Protein backbone atom coordinates (compact mmCIF):
# COMPACT_ATOMS: atom_id res chain seq x y z
CA UNK A 1 0.00 0.00 0.00
CA UNK A 2 3.05 2.24 -0.24
CA UNK A 3 1.81 3.99 -3.39
CA UNK A 4 -1.83 4.14 -2.36
CA UNK A 5 -3.68 6.47 -0.05
CA UNK A 6 -6.62 5.87 2.21
CA UNK A 7 -10.04 6.77 0.86
CA UNK A 8 -10.61 9.98 2.77
CA UNK A 9 -14.02 10.63 1.22
CA UNK A 10 -15.41 7.66 3.19
CA UNK A 11 -15.12 9.72 6.36
CA UNK A 12 -18.17 10.29 8.53
CA UNK A 13 -18.93 12.47 11.53
CA UNK A 14 -18.70 10.79 14.95
CA UNK A 15 -19.19 13.43 17.63
CA UNK A 16 -18.47 16.93 18.88
CA UNK A 17 -17.12 17.32 22.40
CA UNK A 18 -16.29 20.31 24.61
CA UNK A 19 -13.31 18.45 26.14
CA UNK A 20 -11.56 15.07 26.18
CA UNK A 21 -13.87 13.71 28.88
CA UNK A 22 -16.69 13.66 26.34
CA UNK A 23 -14.69 11.91 23.59
CA UNK A 24 -14.95 8.20 22.73
CA UNK A 25 -12.48 5.71 24.19
CA UNK A 26 -8.83 6.66 23.71
CA UNK A 27 -7.85 3.94 21.24
CA UNK A 28 -6.95 3.63 17.59
CA UNK A 29 -5.12 6.33 15.64
CA UNK A 30 -6.11 9.99 15.57
CA UNK A 31 -4.63 12.72 13.40
CA UNK A 32 -5.57 16.23 14.46
CA UNK A 33 -5.88 19.46 12.49
CA UNK A 34 -4.94 22.62 14.38
CA UNK A 35 -4.36 26.22 13.42
CA UNK A 36 -5.17 29.84 13.98
CA UNK A 37 -8.81 30.70 13.57
CA UNK A 38 -8.32 32.22 10.10
CA UNK A 39 -5.88 29.65 8.70
CA UNK A 40 -8.37 27.72 6.54
CA UNK A 41 -8.52 24.59 8.68
CA UNK A 42 -12.12 23.68 7.89
CA UNK A 43 -11.59 24.27 4.18
CA UNK A 44 -8.55 21.98 4.21
CA UNK A 45 -10.51 19.17 5.87
CA UNK A 46 -13.36 19.56 3.40
CA UNK A 47 -10.92 19.50 0.47
CA UNK A 48 -9.04 16.44 1.73
CA UNK A 49 -12.23 14.45 2.25
CA UNK A 50 -14.08 15.81 -0.81
CA UNK A 51 -16.98 16.67 1.49
CA UNK A 52 -18.16 20.21 0.92
CA UNK A 53 -19.61 20.63 4.41
CA UNK A 54 -17.80 18.04 6.53
CA UNK A 55 -16.18 20.73 8.67
CA UNK A 56 -18.24 23.87 9.05
CA UNK A 57 -16.66 26.90 7.45
CA UNK A 58 -17.52 30.43 8.45
CA UNK A 59 -16.56 33.95 7.55
CA UNK A 60 -16.32 34.55 11.31
CA UNK A 61 -12.97 33.30 12.66
CA UNK A 62 -13.22 31.27 15.83
CA UNK A 63 -16.41 29.43 14.85
CA UNK A 64 -14.97 26.00 15.74
CA UNK A 65 -15.46 25.81 19.49
CA UNK A 66 -15.60 22.04 19.99
CA UNK A 67 -13.36 19.05 19.35
CA UNK A 68 -14.92 17.44 16.27
CA UNK A 69 -14.24 13.77 15.53
CA UNK A 70 -14.60 12.07 12.14
CA UNK A 71 -13.91 8.41 11.33
CA UNK A 72 -12.36 7.07 8.12
CA UNK A 73 -12.67 3.43 9.09
CA UNK A 74 -12.63 1.59 12.43
CA UNK A 75 -9.71 2.86 14.52
CA UNK A 76 -8.73 5.69 12.14
CA UNK A 77 -10.04 9.17 12.97
CA UNK A 78 -9.57 12.78 11.89
CA UNK A 79 -9.90 15.46 14.57
CA UNK A 80 -10.84 19.09 13.97
CA UNK A 81 -9.53 21.04 16.96
CA UNK A 82 -10.74 24.47 18.12
CA UNK A 83 -8.99 27.31 16.33
CA UNK A 84 -6.53 29.34 18.37
CA UNK A 85 -5.13 32.85 18.33
CA UNK A 86 -8.31 34.81 17.61
CA UNK A 87 -8.53 37.84 19.90
CA UNK A 88 -12.08 39.07 19.31
CA UNK A 89 -13.89 36.60 21.56
CA UNK A 90 -14.63 36.96 25.28
CA UNK A 91 -11.65 36.10 27.47
CA UNK A 92 -13.59 33.41 29.34
CA UNK A 93 -14.44 31.66 26.08
CA UNK A 94 -10.85 31.93 24.84
CA UNK A 95 -9.50 30.37 28.04
CA UNK A 96 -12.03 27.55 27.76
CA UNK A 97 -10.91 26.79 24.19
CA UNK A 98 -7.24 26.89 25.20
CA UNK A 99 -7.82 24.45 28.06
CA UNK A 100 -9.75 22.07 25.82
CA UNK A 101 -7.02 22.19 23.17
CA UNK A 102 -4.18 21.72 25.66
CA UNK A 103 -5.86 18.77 27.36
CA UNK A 104 -6.39 16.99 24.07
CA UNK A 105 -2.82 17.53 22.88
CA UNK A 106 -1.25 16.49 26.18
CA UNK A 107 -3.41 13.56 27.23
CA UNK A 108 -4.85 11.88 24.15
CA UNK A 109 -2.72 8.76 23.65
CA UNK A 110 -4.28 7.93 20.29
CA UNK A 111 -2.95 11.20 18.81
CA UNK A 112 -0.26 10.06 16.35
CA UNK A 113 0.17 13.07 14.07
CA UNK A 114 -0.62 16.76 13.88
CA UNK A 115 -1.44 18.93 10.87
CA UNK A 116 -0.78 22.59 11.71
CA UNK A 117 -2.18 25.13 9.26
CA UNK A 118 -0.87 28.66 8.75
CA UNK A 119 -1.70 31.35 6.21
CA UNK A 120 1.29 31.33 3.85
CA UNK A 121 1.35 35.14 3.98
CA UNK A 122 1.51 35.27 7.80
CA UNK A 123 3.19 32.11 9.14
CA UNK A 124 4.93 31.30 12.42
CA UNK A 125 3.06 33.52 14.85
CA UNK A 126 3.85 33.03 18.54
CA UNK A 127 0.98 30.59 19.05
CA UNK A 128 2.07 28.62 15.98
CA UNK A 129 5.59 28.33 17.36
CA UNK A 130 4.22 27.15 20.70
CA UNK A 131 2.38 24.35 18.91
CA UNK A 132 5.48 23.36 16.95
CA UNK A 133 7.71 23.40 20.02
CA UNK A 134 5.24 21.25 21.96
CA UNK A 135 5.04 18.78 19.07
CA UNK A 136 8.83 18.62 18.91
CA UNK A 137 9.02 17.95 22.66
CA UNK A 138 6.59 15.07 22.29
CA UNK A 139 8.35 13.87 19.10
CA UNK A 140 5.04 13.93 17.28
CA UNK A 141 5.17 14.05 13.46
CA UNK A 142 3.88 17.33 12.08
CA UNK A 143 2.76 18.42 8.64
CA UNK A 144 2.86 22.20 8.49
CA UNK A 145 0.53 23.37 5.73
CA UNK A 146 1.03 26.88 4.39
CA UNK A 147 -2.55 27.53 3.33
CA UNK A 148 -4.02 29.93 0.79
CA UNK A 149 -0.98 29.27 -1.41
CA UNK A 150 -2.98 30.40 -4.45
CA UNK A 151 -2.68 33.95 -3.10
CA UNK A 152 1.01 33.97 -4.10
CA UNK A 153 2.58 33.42 -7.51
CA UNK A 154 4.88 30.37 -7.81
CA UNK A 155 8.15 32.21 -7.14
CA UNK A 156 7.16 33.95 -3.89
CA UNK A 157 5.25 30.82 -2.86
CA UNK A 158 8.32 28.60 -3.18
CA UNK A 159 10.48 31.18 -1.41
CA UNK A 160 8.07 31.27 1.51
CA UNK A 161 8.08 27.46 1.80
CA UNK A 162 11.89 27.45 1.86
CA UNK A 163 11.96 30.24 4.44
CA UNK A 164 9.58 28.40 6.78
CA UNK A 165 11.44 25.11 6.35
CA UNK A 166 14.65 26.84 7.40
CA UNK A 167 12.94 28.48 10.38
CA UNK A 168 11.59 25.20 11.81
CA UNK A 169 14.57 22.99 10.93
CA UNK A 170 16.06 23.28 14.42
CA UNK A 171 12.91 21.74 15.91
CA UNK A 172 13.69 18.41 14.29
CA UNK A 173 13.20 16.37 11.13
CA UNK A 174 9.66 15.31 12.03
CA UNK A 175 8.21 18.60 10.71
CA UNK A 176 7.24 18.55 7.03
CA UNK A 177 6.41 21.91 5.41
CA UNK A 178 4.24 22.13 2.29
CA UNK A 179 2.24 24.75 0.41
CA UNK A 180 -1.50 24.09 0.31
CA UNK A 181 -4.54 25.54 -1.41
CA UNK A 182 -8.11 24.33 -1.06
CA UNK A 183 -9.00 26.40 -4.12
CA UNK A 184 -6.38 25.10 -6.59
CA UNK A 185 -5.66 21.73 -4.91
CA UNK A 186 -1.98 22.51 -4.31
CA UNK A 187 -0.61 20.03 -1.78
CA UNK A 188 -3.78 17.95 -1.41
CA UNK A 189 -2.22 14.71 -2.68
CA UNK A 190 0.86 15.18 -0.48
CA UNK A 191 -1.42 15.67 2.51
CA UNK A 192 -3.33 12.48 1.74
CA UNK A 193 -0.12 10.48 1.29
CA UNK A 194 1.43 11.78 4.51
CA UNK A 195 -1.68 11.07 6.57
CA UNK A 196 -1.95 7.58 5.11
CA UNK A 197 1.61 6.88 6.24
CA UNK A 198 0.85 8.14 9.73
CA UNK A 199 -2.26 6.00 10.04
CA UNK A 200 -0.40 2.88 8.95
CA UNK A 201 2.55 3.61 11.24
CA UNK A 202 0.22 4.25 14.16
CA UNK A 203 -1.59 0.98 13.53
CA UNK A 204 1.77 -0.83 13.46
CA UNK A 205 2.67 0.76 16.81
CA UNK A 206 -0.53 -0.58 18.34
CA UNK A 207 0.17 -4.03 16.94
CA UNK A 208 3.61 -3.90 18.56
CA UNK A 209 2.06 -2.86 21.85
CA UNK A 210 3.64 0.60 21.87
CA UNK A 211 1.86 3.62 23.33
CA UNK A 212 2.63 7.31 23.04
CA UNK A 213 3.90 8.69 26.36
CA UNK A 214 1.63 10.90 28.40
CA UNK A 215 2.83 14.42 29.05
CA UNK A 216 2.66 16.15 32.40
From Swiss-Prot:
Keyword Cell division: yes
Needed cofactors: Mg(2+)
Classification via PROSITE patterns: G_ENGB (PS51706)
InterPro entries reported in the protein's UniProt record: G_ENGB_dom (IPR030393), GTP-bd (IPR006073), GTP-bd_ribosome_bio_YsxC (IPR019987), P-loop_NTPase (IPR027417)
Sequence intervals crossing the membrane: none
Molecular functions (GO terms): GTP binding; metal ion binding
Binding positions for Mg(2+) per the UniProt entry: 42, 64
Cysteine disulfide links: none
Pfam families per the UniProt record, alphabetical: MMR_HSR1
Binding sites annotated in the UniProt record for GTP: 35-42, 62-66, 80-83, 147-150, 180-182
Coiled-coil annotated spans: none
Record keywords: Cell cycle, Cell division, GTP-binding, Magnesium, Metal-binding, Nucleotide-binding, Septation
GO BP term, example: division septum assembly
Every EngB-type G domain range: 27-201
GO cellular component, one term: cytosol
Function field: Necessary for normal cell division and for the maintenance of normal septation.
Family the entry assigns: Belongs to the TRAFAC class TrmE-Era-EngA-EngB-Septin-like GTPase superfamily. EngB GTPase family.
Stated name of the protein: Probable GTP-binding protein EngB
Organism: Aeromonas hydrophila subsp. hydrophila (strain ATCC 7966 / DSM 30187 / BCRC 13018 / CCUG 14551 / JCM 1027 / KCTC 2358 / NCIMB 9240 / NCTC 8049)
Gene: engB
Amino acid sequence: MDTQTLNFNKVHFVTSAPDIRHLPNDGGVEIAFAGRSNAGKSSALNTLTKHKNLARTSKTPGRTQLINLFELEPGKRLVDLPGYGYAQVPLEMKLKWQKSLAEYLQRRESLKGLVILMDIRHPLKDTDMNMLEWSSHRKLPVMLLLTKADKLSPGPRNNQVIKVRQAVAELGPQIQVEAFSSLTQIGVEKLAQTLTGWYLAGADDMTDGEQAPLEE
